UniProtKB/Swiss-Prot annotation:
This is Protein chiffon. It comes from Drosophila melanogaster. Named after the phenotype of mutant embryos that possess a thin fragile eggshell resembling the chiffon fabric. Residues 549-560, 908-932, 1435-1445 have a biased composition (Basic and acidic residues). It comes from the Eukaryota. The gene is chif. Residues 365-378, 1453-1475, 1483-1518 have a biased composition (Acidic residues).
Length: 1711
């Protein structure tokens, strides 16, 4: 029986069950089925009854049972599960008792029955014994008598165990429990294999785990060191076979599956040998699976002949094959593999990551010797790559795997590992000694370097592999390098071999983490220094590098030029080695370094080596920081970009110096290099030659070999591409450096750009390198032409500045070369350097410079990309990298984007200006910095965002000052600074004519797209946005899809996606007609070549911009969530140039001109409107007032058909959601060009003044007098047009920088909005400026933000497309004017809420007069901007309140709600008008209110269902109002806008009210009107209408603050709103407070007397608003809300209104 019990499953988990089952079968009563539990008390369910005579045994068993959690029963009852007895089982004794069979049934003797024991007594015992046994049974209660035994046995529910079996079972459970507790918890209280999920991974292992932890992690223990997976590039099996023990001869010969087969056998042996030590059955299963054909591991070790039997696709050739070996030997494959051009991408990747060459560069001295040897070896390997790599890799992998734990590494190749004693080692030894030493080298790169082996000519570190112990002792960085050392399996050694040396296979991960942190911290070479500090040779470099790091800008600059010599001295040996290695044929060295790289970069091998050395050198310099040269994902080596700057520096000093020891050195070099671009050019040429010999600088050495390799390879393969990219990258880096220096993070950027610069000179070492260096110097010269002066000047002021400027000068030079000097080699050179350096920089970040799309984006960022876009009806937009070859600078100028041309021109100008800027280098540098900052955003560096912004602002200030003297300089500064403050933006807009702005923008554009968008803000941004809208390029997805970029820009991308989705819906709608169509003389309508990448590109945020956006957006979002904005005031709206002066309008006025125009506008406004509230009259408001007049002027003129685009010639084509496609007619292009054309600021100012005097007054008068029909037409058209053109992207798109967002200038967004609103180019420009600011503020501040803080209003931009008419820039009602009269209405807080929502809902803005002033334009912007910017305006301004509403819908809702309540309560007399007017206005107001509410709700879009019904109902209503009052209102509103003060008169009030009402209703149609109406809404009118609605419908209770959407439904409320109109104006100023916060108190307090009550009511009703407004608006306000929604939605958002209304109130409530 015992044997049987033993036979039972090892885990007694089921033992009882089986026994009980057996018993059940034997016995009628089924024994209990109890299972062992996997826990510390496995027998917790067991209840034992012990019938044991032996006391000791009973005590022992009892203690064991208790220890295992079992229970002991002292009475034999049915509860017991097991009956343990020491009595012999009666097999036959139970004759006649059916229970006996149970014992046999359970062959286990434990089923001995009491009956059996009783029967025995019956048979042989005396009667006393029988009685005793019977008594025992009775005591147990199971057996009453021997005769009853059968029945008891039948009835018994327990299992009978013999004591011996019980002991065995207990012992088994104990052992299992011990294992379970020891970590074999998988085996949890039962079988060893019971819990394979908890395996203790020891030694080397690969673990694949899901981040979400939805799946059980997969792990693979690597018991044998050579089992460690290796990427054997030279194996026939493929690059990523799990190279196991049989990696030697078979692998050497074929590198196919035969070695795999042998590996399999070895692994089988291992499995057999390890079966005993196997920790878990799961491990055994894994081992077995490896032998199983279908198992994942079996794939790695396919049968030896599998390659012959199995067909497949060659991933290299992309060809299918039946037999792998035959295919590998085919000419096609060989030719393909030998063509290094086929592996450029891989080469780039490899070079950007840990690299053998880099490692060699890191250890130049050893590298020299080893490089020579390695080259011979590498040649041999090239001849027989499979043979050598396989043994080397196998041995290396073995040792690496063991290396961690065992001294096998130390012992040598022979000692594979305890587990694999010598199979791997013998194989390795069996292989060429080179392979063994190579493996050792790989394992211990440093040691290898120390002990050069003839076998390992490639890396000294590899050679040191001969003495594994030393290598093993080396720090992980060297190990990393060793892994990379692998020539043919550069990746496998990199990835696998080194980690074991580091003692951690996970060390790779750790390194990566370190790399990431460092890389993120220092995108430039510094990241490399930190990430890949070298301990051996690198120490010297690191020592030099450290000083460079410490003195980055000062010492670094000095070292960059001179101090690098210290680095050069350190590097001199390495450089000498590198040079010697370089001395070896670059191709040979390259081959030696990496077979894969060899293939790809045949001639570039030396360059790769040099690059690696450079990178390694940088790493070495960073030896204090861990470096992982062999890291598979090594950053391309910030040093590579650095080498270029270093070369420049060395140009000053020597290229040895120029070569950066480290990224820090590179930074210094960049500084130095920046100092003298021409010197750098010359030095590059000379230094490039010197570099070959004088890469003594650690960086220099590393950089130089890299440059050689890179340059050769890249020149040969990607010379054009890489150089082009390099130029762009250099440009970006330079810009980054400038901006970085400004920001305090310039060093990082500088480092990057310097690397590129340095790389170029070093490349010159080779003939190609020299050529590239010369070309680069040419580029540098070209760039320097404009930049050199700056660079030199800056250099003299400060080397750090020189750094910054030098990169910028290279940037400019490169840009110029891209444009003027298009030498392919130059481009290649730049690209190769910058590209790989950039790649290294971003390897762990976001910039995959090696990828085509990234190059395209870089080009785009630099404004050098030629967009071959098509404006067809197709919805598909090619990604930038899908658009074909990236045009070179040498491409026909026609193909060169305007930015490129402008950049070349601007560079020339800069050449001249640089001298000026030498005098005032800060502003110029600021401009460059801006450009660079934007470029560097891609670098994700804005470490010092605030510093950067400050600097930008300062730069802007300086440039603004310069702008008066030098419009171009100002423009550059403006572009770069991107109007840090609204005032700056206003200045920019007002200060420069459109032409000036355009030139500025063009210039900036050429410099950097983001910078361009900033400076363009007034002119070019408008055009770009228009063009972007016209031909909305899809956001560049590739870079954003890049993991690092995604991480950096994910928030931006999300926001842009939101805005785009909304924008797309709007995009589907025709772009809102700009004022230009209405203008008889469209100023901007001159055809602007949409080809200008800047124009097209402005929409997509550049990586730099995105980085900046990410930072600023996060800040802005936080602010928005708090209801704050960086600038908690409405963005100053630039004074719109009168529509009459079309050319002027399209240009920014000089500050003086703007001031004059503002004065004029102010006079006009005051003359026309007495209501103007000085409090509300901000500069922006005044500008807006001017704008309204301009808008008014243009509005009648600019009545685009509903379907017309932003410009007359621009038609939106049906497009897919997310894509805006426009057709541009010549007139539109002309208008755009005209807008961009430069105009003398003074002339523009004069024009503005004159226009304001003449046209403005006329319009002021006319607007008051203009028939409502005309205005309604303009409004309607605008309504139609505005919604059609959603802002191309989020308010955070590249169109406007976050700086602009922060500044509240709607930079590019505003321009786009201007265009979309269809303002005439001139007035559109002016108004666009205002709109841009307002919309920007809306976008930035007023954007209704979800709880998440992201603007929900973007939906409104989509849905607001219809409502966007309100945002029509043409009709920008100067809510200053309106707002002056109506800023007070606290009760219009609902309106204010609406204004914030009007940001969301343009009409809503009307609530706040102050905001309304801004919003009059902002609303236009919002609506005109397709409501995309609806939240753009800062919530602070009431003008911006609408705009603000978009960004912060909840706050806006609450604030607006509160405001309407306050306004209602206030019943400001200011806006009291005749009952007829009141009624009309109230209807309009109610419509507007509802529209606003709809806007708010639309933002929320919670009640989209109701929207359609309401919209339809309201649409009719609104249309009537719109057509009747809106014209009047519009006429008044424009006049109000232009001459808000005069219009503030009763007529103005009426107009305002009408505009308010009409705008509210027609806000969609006329943003200006909407704004005015909003102001009037703020006026008690709105409040009254709101209040009336609210009062009658107390369901809303305080929901009236929600501008009782029902107000529209309650037409009777008009009277109330009229009565309350005056107060709202009085309280408008308080409403200037950002609505975004939705702080009712925020708005209520300014509402003076009524502020408290309204605030209290609003606060009290805040919650009610959400509920009541949602419900009441839905119920009672269905009609009114629909009217409201229709009012602003009529065009754009009819579907959303109901939902938005419901949602908006709720949104308000939260705030």
């Amino acid at each position: 029986m015992q044997p049987q019990s033993d036979k039972q499953s090892a885990s007694r988990l089921a033992t009882t069950t089986s026994h009980s089952t057996a018993a059940a079968s034997a016995t009628a009563a089924t024994p209990p089925k109890v299972k062992v539990i996997k826990s510390k008390r496995p027998l917790c369910h067991f209840k034992f009854y012990l019938d044991i005579c032996d006391h000791q045994l009973a005590k022992r068993i009892e203690s064991d049972i208790k220890a295992l959690g079992g229970h002991l029963e002292f009475f034999l009852s049915d509860d017991i599960t097991h009956f343990v007895t020491d009595k012999p089982e009666v097999i036959g004794g139970t004759s006649g008792t059916p229970g006996t069979p149970s014992t046999p049934g359970t062959p286990t003797s434990h089923y001995q029955q009491n009956d059996g024991s009783a029967r025995k007594p019956n048979q042989r015992q005396s009667r006393a014994d029988a009685i005793l046994s019977r008594v025992r049974r009775s005591t147990v209660g199971v057996v009453n008598s021997g005769n009853s035994t059968p029945t008891t046995s039948l009835k018994r529910s327990y299992t009978i165990w013999q004591t011996d079996y019980a002991q065995r079972f207990i012992k088994r459970i104990q052992t299992e429990l011990k294992q379970y507790l020891e970590g074999k918890k998988e085996g949890g209280g039962g079988s060893t294999s019971a819990s394979p999920h908890h395996i203790q991974l020891k030694k080397q292992y690969v673990k694949i785990e899901s981040v979400k932890r939805n799946y059980r992690p997969y792990y693979h223990l690597i018991k044998q060191p050579d089992d460690w997976p290796k990427i054997d590039l030279s194996s026939e099996d493929g690059a990523f076979r799990l190279l196991t023990k049989s990696k030697t001869k078979d692998k050497e010969h074929s590198m196919t599956r035969k070695p795999l087969g042998s590996r399999t056998s070895q692994k089988d042996k291992q499995a057999a040998g390890e079966a005993k030590p196997l920790q878990h059955p799961s491990l055994q299963e894994l081992k077995k699976q490896s032998a199983i054909p279908n198992s994942p591991r079996s794939n790695c070790r396919e049968p030896i002949d599998s390659s012959e039997k199995q067909g497949g696709v060659c991933e290299i050739c992309k060809l299918e094959y039946d037999i792998l070996n035959i295919h590998l030997q085919s000419k096609d494959h060989e030719l393909f593999a030998k063509n290094s051009d086929n592996f450029l991408a891989l080469d780039t990747l490899i070079q950007s990551s840990a690299d053998v060459n880099r490692f060699l560069e890191e250890e130049p001295v050893e590298s020299e010797l080893d490089m020579d040897v390695d080259e011979s070896l590498s040649n041999e390997e090239l001849q027989s790559p499979r043979q050598r790599p396989s043994p080397a890799l196998r041995e290396k992998s073995k040792r690496i795997t063991k290396g961690k734990h065992s001294s096998e590494k130390f012992q040598g190749v022979a000692v594979a590992s305890p587990q694999t004693p010598f199979p791997g080692a013998k194989k390795v030894q069996g292989n060429s000694p080179g392979s063994l030493s190579e493996l050792q080298r790989q394992e211990h790169p440093t040691t290898a370097a120390a002990t050069p082996t003839t076998n390992s000519g490639r890396r000294k570190t590899q050679n040191s592999g001969l003495s594994p112990p030393k290598r093993a002792m080396l720090p992980p960085s060297s190990i990393y390098k060793v892994v990379e050392t692998r020539e043919e399996c550069a990746t496998p050694p990199r990835g696998r071999g080194r980690p074991p040396n580091q003692v951690d296979s996970p060390s790779l991960i750790v390194k990566f983490q370190k790399i990431r942190q460092t890389e993120l911290q220092r995108l430039n070479g510094e990241a490399e220094n930190f990430m890949f500090p070298r301990t051996a040779v690198p120490t010297t470099r690191s020592s030099s590098e450290l000083p460079t790091d410490v003195d980055r800008q000062t010492t670094s600059d000095v070292r960059g030029r001179y101090s690098i010599s210290s680095a050069s001295l350190d590097t001199s040996t390495s450089e000498a080695e590198t040079k010697e290695s370089s001395g070896l044929p670059t191709s040979i060295r390259k081959r030696a370094q990496a077979v894969g790289r060899r293939r790809k970069v045949g001639g570039a091998a030396a360059q790769d080596v040099f690059q690696r050395q450079l990178s390694t050198g940088s790493s070495s310099s960073n030896s204090n920081q861990q470096r992982f040269p062999s890291a598979p994902i090594q950053p391309e080596e910030g040093p590579q970009p650095q080498p270029k700057p270093q070369l420049k520096i060395k140009i000053k000093q020597e290229q040895l110096v120029a070569t950066r020891k480290s990224s820090r050195t590179a930074t210094a070099i960049v500084t130095a290099a920046t100092a003298s671009s021409h010197q750098q050019q010359q030095l590059r040429q000379t230094t490039c030659r010197k570099m070959a010999n004088k890469l003594e600088d650690r960086m220099g050495e590393l950089v130089k070999p890299k440059i050689k390799i890179k340059k050769e390879v890249i020149e040969e393969q990607k010379v054009k591409e890489l150089e082009d990219l390099e130029e762009i990258l250099d440009k970006e880096l330079d810009e980054e450096v400038d901006s970085s220096c400004s920001s305090g993070s310039d060093e990082d950027y500088i480092a990057g750009s310097q690397r590129r610069i340095t790389a170029a000179p070093r490349k010159s070492t080779d003939t190609r390198e020299q050529r590239a260096a010369r070309r680069l110097s040419r580029l540098t010269i070209n760039r320097s032409a404009g930049e050199l002066e700056l660079t030199e000047v800056k250099t003299s002021p400060s080397k750090s500045r020189t750094k910054i400027q030098k990169p910028s000068s290279p940037t400019k030079n490169k840009v110029k070369q891209t444009k003027a000097v298009p030498p392919a080699i130059d481009l290649f050179f730049d690209c190769s350097k910058s590209e790989r350096l950039r790649e290294m920089q971003y390897t762990f970040e976001s910039l995959p410079s090696g990828e085509l799309w990234n190059r395209v984006f870089l080009r785009q960022d630099a404004g050098e990309e030629n967009y071959y876009t098509y404006y067809g009806s197709t919805n598909y937009r090619k990604l930038p990298y899908e658009m074909g070859p990236i045009p070179m600078a040498k491409t026909l100028p026609a193909h060169s984007c305007a930015l490129c041309r402008e950049a070349s021109e601007v560079k020339q100008d800069k050449g001249e200006q640089i001298k000026l800027e030498d005098q005032k280098p800060a502003p110029k540098k600021e401009v460059k910095k801006e450009e660079e900052v934007q470029s560097s955003s891609s670098s994700a560096t804005y470490k010092n965002k605030k510093l950067h912004l400050l600097q930008r602002y300062q730069q802007e200030q300086e440039q603004l000052q310069q702008l008066e003297g030098n419009s171009l300089a100002t423009a550059g500064a403006k572009c770069d600074s991107k109007a840090s403050t609204p005032e700056l933006l206003e200045r920019e807009f007002a200060s420069g004519s459109m032409g000036d702005r355009v030139q500025l923008i063009e210039r900036v554009r050429s410099t950097s797209s983001s910078s361009c968008s900033n400076s363009q803000r007034s002119g070019i941004t408008c055009r770009n946005k228009q063009l972007a809208r016209i031909a909305e390029l899809p956001p560049r997805k590739s870079p954003r899809e890049h993991a690092s970029t995604l991480a950096l820009v994910s928030c931006i991308i999300r926001q842009r996606q939101d805005s785009q989705s909304k924008t797309n819906s709007e995009a589907e709608e025709p772009p809102p007609p700009v004022a230009a169509p209405k203008l008889k003389t469209p100023i901007k309508q001159e055809p602007v070549a949409p080809s200008s990448p800047r124009t097209t590109r402005s929409q997509a945020a550049t990586p730099v911009e995105e980085l900046r956006f990410a930072t600023e957006i996060s800040e802005t979002v936080k602010r928005m969530r708090r209801g704050q904005n960086k600038y908690d005031h409405s963005p100053p709206a630039p004074v719109p140039t009168p529509a009459t002066s079309s050319p002027v309008r399209s240009r920014r006025l000089t500050p003086a001109a703007r001031n004059q125009s503002q004065i004029y506008s102010r006079r006009l406004e005051f003359a026309t409107s007495q209501r103007e509230s000085s409090a509300s009259a901000l500069l922006g408001k005044r500008k807006r007032r001017v704008n309204p007049s301009v808008a008014g002027t243009v509005r009648p003129t600019t009545q685009n058909l509903p379907g017309t685009g932003a410009y007359r010639g621009v038609r939106k084509l049906p497009s897919k959601k997310g894509l805006l496609e426009y057709e541009m007619e010549t007139c539109a292009l002309k208008a755009l060009d005209q807008a961009r054309q430069y105009c003398n600021p003074g002339f523009v100012a004069w024009q503005l003044d004159k226009y304001l005097e003449l046209a403005g007054k006329e319009y002021d008068i006319e607007f008051d007098q203009i028939s409502p029909e005309v205005e309604s037409e303009g409004r309607e058209e605008r309504l139609v047009n505005t919604p059609q053109t959603p802002p191309p992207t989020d308010c955070f798109t590249s169109e406007f920088d976050l700086c602009d967002l922060i500044m509240g200038s709607a930079g590019s967004g505003d321009d786009d909005e201007d265009v979309s609103r269809g303002n005439p180019p001139g007035s559109g420009r002016r108004m666009s400026n205002l709109n841009l600011y307002a919309s920007y503020y809306r976008k930035r501040k007023s954007l209704k933000s979800n709880r998440t803080g992201w603007p929900k209003a973007q939906r409104r931009r989509n849905a607001g497309g219809l409502g966007g008419s309100r945002a029509l820039p043409d009709e920008r009602i100067n809510f200053q004017k309106m707002g002056l009269a109506e800023l007070h209405p606290i009760k219009q807080e609902p309106m204010e809420t609406e204004e914030e929502q009007t940001t969301t809902t343009t009409t809503t803005t009307t609530t706040s007069a102050t905001r309304g002033n801004l919003l009059s334009k902002d609303d236009e912007d919002d609506e005109g901007g397709g409501n995309s910017p609806s939240g753009g305006s800062p919530a602070d301004d009431k003008q911006n309140s609408r705009e603000d509403a978009v960004m912060t819908p909840p706050a806006t809702d609450v604030d607006e709600q509160a405001e309407p309540q306050a306004d209602e309560m206030e019943s400001l007399p200011d806006e009291d008008e005749t009952m007829a007017d009141s009624v009309d206005q109230q209807q309009d107001v109610e419509a507007e209110i509802e529209a606003t509410d709809a806007d708010v709700e639309e933002e929320e879009e919670e009640e989209d269902e109701d929207e359609d019904v309401f919209e339809d109902a309201y649409e009719e209503q609104d249309m009537g109002i719109q057509k009747t009052e809106p014209h009047e209102k519009r006429a008044r509103i424009p006049s109000i806008s232009v001459t808000t003060p005069p219009e503030d008169s009763s007529q103005g009030k009426k107009l305002l009210l009408t505009l308010h009402n009409g705008q509210r209703l027609q806000a969609t149609s006329t943003p200006s009107t909407g704004q005015v109406q909003q102001h009037q809404r703020r006026t008690p009118q709105l409040n009254g209408s709101l209040g009336s609605c609210i009062s009658p419908s107390e369901k809303l209770g305080d929901n009236s603050d929600i501008f009782t959407v029902s107000s529209d439904g309650l037409d009777t409320d008009l009277d109330l709103s009229n009565t309350q109109a005056g107060d709202s104006h009085e309280h408008c100023p308080h409403q200037t407070t950002p609505k975004r916060k939705f702080d009712i108190s925020k708005y209520a307090p300014p509402n003076s007397g009524k502020a408290a009550s309204s605030c209290a009511a609003e606060a009290a009703t805040a919650a009610v608003k959400s509920l009541a407004i949602s419900q009441f608006l839905k119920k009672e306000t269905c009609a009114s809300s629909s009217s409201m929604r229709n009012a602003w939605r009529r065009t754009q958002r009819r579907a959303i209104s109901a939902a938005c209304i419901s949602a908006a109130p709720s949104a308000r409530v939260p705030n």
